[in-house]
């Protein structure tokens, strides 16, 4: 039986390990932490449970596909669909509840934003078309293999290239709405890959289709159950885990991978899959291999500053996902990407899993995951930024919800870009690897194979096709397919 080593037990590493196990490999995962899941982790504090990382669940079939590889194994994993994706709030009192039923969304958006139904319907139809035209090429195949470009999917994408909006920004595409609030709502989808709507290409108008066309979901027991259920499955099917054992070097001979080294010794392997961020993979584990500097020096995606608050009352006007919009969205993104700091009036995201899982907070209380988009760590004074941002967030909540939330916070845990990098090795704390702030970004991400070292592969949010749960799972699928063809 051939051996495979996976570096990192994030969602991409777990998925890659399961797919390789299904191919017949003996698989060992090395993980520096004492838990599996990477960013998909959770903590409990003073009677509250908090999911630390990704909070939005879309494309659940990508998780189900992994369970389907091992139908004889029964894992407790369920989820439910959400009728409302987000509650959106503005300072002037405007509230919009975004239905995941497109017809209802069109009806409600037309009423709230005074926009023509036909305009919204056309936009959503275009979003769906872009997604269906590009998903096979951009999300399900390697963009770095010549064979990809001789497929029918590629021909379709090329024929429809003018329709995809590659030469416009997302904001250009969305400014066709008369109401700037609706433009802002759709501009927010740039943050799903850690980018600015004023720079990322118009093709990103396909992202709303994931929510408004294909639906949003909530896993029973919280987002942490996604990573935990895959961890449980991996254990059941014989994947071995070595926790608290950091890989210090990827070993090679004659430009071919031979295994890895850790503080505990050397391990031989027929192939290695790195789920570590691509920058520290080269900088720390491949010091003798010339690094692809152009790839590694790309602008990093946004990070996040997150406050986890136990709240001593309930807010019926809030749902699982809530957005309190900035009054100056463009300035907010300029601060993040150009000035590497935080705006005075940030957009605030509040995720409350106790709305779905009552055990996540004491009776009559709620667990608030309160996040603002942030730049990565470039040596800023995070202690000061945390202090200032907390005041600004409290002020934003007061404007939109008419309550001084500071009087209701019973416990607090804070995660900064520095903390994200420390916990997950994500370079500068970037949540999605490289930003997608230009039309070539998809092609400039590091491939899922290594061009210099044979039998070395890469998965996760810093490589193709990108960050977020669905794309990390797809990166594992692409990589496993490459391995099956090449080995």
UniProtKB/Swiss-Prot annotation:
Pathway-wise, it operates in: Carotenoid biosynthesis
Enzyme superclass (EC): oxidoreductase
- List, in alphabetical order, the GO biological process terms annotated in this UniProt record: carotenoid biosynthetic process
Sites where the protein binds FAD: 12, 31, 39, 55-56, 247, 275, 431, 461, 468-469
Reported EC number(s) for this entry are: 1.3.99.27
What is the superkingdom listed in this entry's lineage? Bacteria
> How does the record describe its quaternary structure?
Monomer.
The record's function comment reads: Can also use 1-hydroxy-all-trans-1,2-dihydro-neurosporene, 1,1'-dihydroxy-1,1',2,2'-tetrahydroneurosporene and 1,1'-dihydroxy-1,1',2,2'-tetrahydrolycopene. Probably involved in the synthesis of myxol, a gamma-carotene derivative. May use FAD as a proton acceptor.
Q: Which family does it belong to?
A: Belongs to the carotenoid/retinoid oxidoreductase family.
UniProt protein name: 1-hydroxycarotenoid 3,4-desaturase
Source organism per entry reads Nonlabens dokdonensis (strain DSM 17205 / KCTC 12402 / DSW-6)
User: What lineage, starting at the top, does this entry show?
Assistant: Bacteria, Pseudomonadati, Bacteroidota, Flavobacteriia, Flavobacteriales
